[in-house]
């Protein structure tokens, strides 16, 4: 909370002034820090202090604001004079400050949305939470959701959010040992629910079904009923809001296959390849690991009657496998499996850890398909979001191995040396290739005393003299600048 010092002549401000209000700044504990006069202008909130410069908060920099009985609070952004923070002021006219600020926001064409805050009753003192999202339209008496349906009347205090959304890290929560007396920060025991804003024409056409529930807690529908309800639903009651999410596009495809082939609706730990095929005429869905690409004879096996699946079979299969792949085991587990795989490198068995293109042993992907996904996102609250893989075949490790085997080093190449015989230089030497040892360095010659006869002798002094003579030649083209280095022409 911001700390503000004493006020500017509080007695001179009448109690019913339209734009000036007597306020007292409080901290997280509700302790009064100082008093002042809060003034609402056409563009900013001004706090007048005694013998100090006034503090200003432009309306465009306010993230959210609200009131509760005799407490007015707001959250400022990073561009304000005070920086980012939450400020609370006690005032008997807190509701008037809120309403006036709401009107000024709308007059300045600032997008203001009201957020419903639903608080469950508990034994602790009533506290309210600052909402973390702003996706509801403006309202004064009845909160409303983004899809146009009216919500339940707000039992708690009212909060409005400015266009900028703060991050969750910007909200200040009291320490575990604190018991805040001012109703601004909420505890972890309180539940708050919000409705996501749908975007796009498809979401607008498929609006949520809104079904009011009687008072009291209503348990979630069973998982079997959730699978039959294809559209997301929102259940409202005065105390809280219940959500039932619809299946994902990948889940819809699985449900379509299950509706076509009843044998697909097996227990969660049932293998697709082990069950009897009771409906051979219907298309069958097969799941496999496709992290390295689809192999021949695997993937989606559909009948020719499914014309819509012919062009997008690989793409939809990849989407299904991407969402339903189990998490990989830790890398350190591959060290134990690697020791077992090194023993079988000489044979043709596939129990080793020679990785394929996708990091798993070759020839085993079709034998251990993944578990069928049977849970939707509605049941993900109590279950894992990834299916559990089936029991792996004995002797066939499925651990991802990053130690890709590389071919051994190539044998060193042999270098052939030949000696050139110069005329008049010593005796004749035999011609022909000589193959030294494999070490790469030439071996010792049989005649070390005559090894210098095979090379030409360069006269370094003569070479330097010829170079100096060439540089000293005169240049009469007129383009060379005369310096002390080339001004003297040496005779040829």
Swiss-Prot record:
Phosphoprotein keyword on record: yes
InterPro entries for this protein: Docking_Protein_DOK, FRS2_PTB, IRS_PTB, PH-like_dom_sf
Localization (cell): Membrane
Any one biological process term the GO annotation gives: fibroblast growth factor receptor signaling pathway
Disulfide bond recorded as keyword: no
UniProt PTM comment: Phosphorylated on tyrosine residues upon stimulation by BFGF or NGFB.
Signal peptide: none
Composition skew (Low complexity), residue ranges: 374-385
Biased composition range(s): Polar residues: 133-147, 166-185
Membrane topology listed for this record: Lipid-anchor
One Pfam family in the UniProt entry: IRS
Assigned GO CC terms: cytoplasm; plasma membrane
Disulfide bridge positions per record: none
GO MF entries: fibroblast growth factor receptor binding; identical protein binding; transmembrane receptor protein tyrosine kinase adaptor activity
Residue ranges of domain IRS-type PTB in the record: 13-115
Assembly: Binds NTRK1, FGFR1, NGFR, GRB2, PTPN11 and ERK2.
Name assigned to this protein: Fibroblast growth factor receptor substrate 3
Gene: Frs3
């Amino acid at each position: 909370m911001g700390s503000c010092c004493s006020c500017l002549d509080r007695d001179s401000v009448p109690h019913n002034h339209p734009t000036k209000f007597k306020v007292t700044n409080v901290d997280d504990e509700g302790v009064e820090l100082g008093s002042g006069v809060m003034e609402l202008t056409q563009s900013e909130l001004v706090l007048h202090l005694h013998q100090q410069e006034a503090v200003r908060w432009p309306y465009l920099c306010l993230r959210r604001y609200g009131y509760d009985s005799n407490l007015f609070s707001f959250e400022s952004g990073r561009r304000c004079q005070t920086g980012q923070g939450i400020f609370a002021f006690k005032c008997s006219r807190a509701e008037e400050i809120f309403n006036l600020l709401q009107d000024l926001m709308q007059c300045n064409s600032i997008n203001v949305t009201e957020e419903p805050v639903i608080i469950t009753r508990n034994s602790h003192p009533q506290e309210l939470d600052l909402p973390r999202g702003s996706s509801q339209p403006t309202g004064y008496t009845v909160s409303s959701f983004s899809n146009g349906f009216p919500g339940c009347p707000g039992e708690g205090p009212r909060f409005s959010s400015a266009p900028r959304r703060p991050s969750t890290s910007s909200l200040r929560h009291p320490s575990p040992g604190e018991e805040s007396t001012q109703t601004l920060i909420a505890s972890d025991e309180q539940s708050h629910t919000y409705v996501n804003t749908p975007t796009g024409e498809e979401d607008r056409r498929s609006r949520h079904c809104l079904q009011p529930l009687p008072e009291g807690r209503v348990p979630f529908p069973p998982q079997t009923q959730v699978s039959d309800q294809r559209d997301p639903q929102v259940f409202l009651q005065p105390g809280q809001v219940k959500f039932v999410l619809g299946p994902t596009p990948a889940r819809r495809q699985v449900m379509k296959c299950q509706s076509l082939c009843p044998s697909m609706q097996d227990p969660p730990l049932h293998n697709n390849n082990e069950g009897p095929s009771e409906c051979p005429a219907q298309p069958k869905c097969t799941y496999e690991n496709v992290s390295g690409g689809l192999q021949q004879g695997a993937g989606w096996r559909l009948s020719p009657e499914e014309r819509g699946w012919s062009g997008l079979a690989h793409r939809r299969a990849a989407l299904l496998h991407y969402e339903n792949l189990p998490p990989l085991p830790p890398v350190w587990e591959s060290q134990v499996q690697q020791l077992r795989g090194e023993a079988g490198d000489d044979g043709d068995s596939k129990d080793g850890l020679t990785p394929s293109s996708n990091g798993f042993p070759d020839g085993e992907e079709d034998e251990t398909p993944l578990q069928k996904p049977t849970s939707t996102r509605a049941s993900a609250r109590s279950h894992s979001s990834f299916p559990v893989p089936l029991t792996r075949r004995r002797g066939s490790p499925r651990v991802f191995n990053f130690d890709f085997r590389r071919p051994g080093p190539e044998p060193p190449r042999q270098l052939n040396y030949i000696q050139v015989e110069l005329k008049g230089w010593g005796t004749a030497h035999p011609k022909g290739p000589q193959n030294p040892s494999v070490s790469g360095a030439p071996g010792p010659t049989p005649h070390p005393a005559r090894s210098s006869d095979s090379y030409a002798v360069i006269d370094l002094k003569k070479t330097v003299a010829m170079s100096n003579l060439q540089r000293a030649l005169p240049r009469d083209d007129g383009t060379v600048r005369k310096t002390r280095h080339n001004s003297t022409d040496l005779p040829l």
